[in-house]
Amino acid sequence: MSKTDVSGLSQLGRQVDAPTSPETAVLERVPNTNAGTDYVVRFTAPEFTSLCPMTGQPDFAHIVIDYIPGDFLVESKSLKLFMTSFRNHGSFHEDCSIYIAKRLVDLLDPKWLRIGAYWYPRGGIPIDVFWQTGEVPKGVWLPDQGVPTYRGRG
């Protein structure tokens, strides 16, 4: 097993303040030492929070990000800090969800990426947002995201 070069990272192994906005959050990447192999990386954020841009009230989501890396992997501490940066950020559910996915695509240029953002109800209506870069490459095992649609007490 080869060792990953982490010399260019600015956050891993250091105490870092949470970014004040998603736009200023620094996402970092590391080389993928298995770049010749297609495999799925999954990140799950079951307690994602942001703010409603109209009321300032908190919004909550269970977010699942799956991607097939190319030459790079997202460094997980930077992803955690990026996701945390939404806590005081006002934006609609759709905007948050797609922004997260596109920032990762811009950073990583993955072979494939999808996001499932399962937002908890506000005003009685749950909003789920799904986006992916294209068809899943053949031969890749892609498990279900495992988040049931919202049923309330039903």
Swiss-Prot record:
Keywords: Cytoplasm, NADP, Oxidoreductase, Queuosine biosynthesis. It is found in: Cytoplasm. It catalyses: 7-aminomethyl-7-carbaguanine + 2 NADP(+) = 7-cyano-7-deazaguanine + 2 NADPH + 3 H(+). GO terms for cellular component: cytoplasm. Residues 1-24 are annotated as: Disordered. PANTHER family: NADPH-DEPENDENT 7-CYANO-7-DEAZAGUANINE REDUCTASE. Catalyzes the NADPH-dependent reduction of 7-cyano-7-deazaguanine (preQ0) to 7-aminomethyl-7-deazaguanine (preQ1). Belongs to the GTP cyclohydrolase I family. QueF type 1 subfamily. This is NADPH-dependent 7-cyano-7-deazaguanine reductase. The gene is queF.
